[in-house]
Amino acid sequence: MNVISKLAHVDPTAKIGDNVIIEPFVYIEGNVEIGDGCHIRPNAVIRSGARIGANNHIFEGSIIAATPQDFRWNGEESFVIIGDNNTIREHVIINRSSHRDGATRIGSNSFIMAQTHIGHDCHIGNYCVLGTAVKVAGDVSIGNYTILSSNALVHERCDVGDVCLIKGGCRVNSHVPPFTIMAHNPIEYKGINSFVLRKIGKSEATIDEIASAYRHLYHSNTSTYNALRRIEVDVEDSPEKTAIIKFLKDHKLTVAAVPLDLEGD
């Protein structure tokens, strides 16, 4: 049974699942879908285009599917699609896509802390943590099991791979390859995210091979092209090696924290 406060505004066309709690002063527009078991706290705003899965907990003052902060947007219908089992804390803003029928996507089982901003057309993976006051610009992709610590900034159109750790206050201005730790401003490579790799069941041998790959990239004083060739030859084959090589190739060897004079070939 749903518990919907009489002091909340819920558009009659909004689709609300079962066992949903909607507290006073929540504002829910039309063209909204909210899955089973969600809990929406006071003063949250769920705007047109929100597609929210099951068992999400949305705290006070958050705005889901805010209109995109993008001069290209001309009022087209677009969406925010959120998976299941996420916690979205106070005053989080998630903008919908700036493209017709496009979507900003949030996966499942993530924790988005207070005052975080997620721009238009972002894709946030599963099991992510975004710390307090993280700012993610438009068209950013964040991989699974990645942590962005408080006050981290991610520039538009940057991709952050799986199982990364971006430390507090770090400014990400290029693509961050998977399994790495980045810190500071300007951004610096600080090793691999071995703690979370162990948490998700990666073996010590696998972790050592990941570390070996990134020694070629960040500690060999060679170009990213040569580092890629060395990784292909020297590192044992594994899904993680494949993911690293694919990321480097997909981003044309342009990755964060590599000195400009060592980029490319």
Model-derived regions, located:
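Terminal amphipathic alpha-helical/low-complexity segments used for targeting or macromolecular assembly
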Residues: 1-7, 12-13, 18-19, 55, ...
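Structural signal for interior beta-strand "rungs" in well-ordered beta-sheet cores
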Residues: 3-183, 187-188
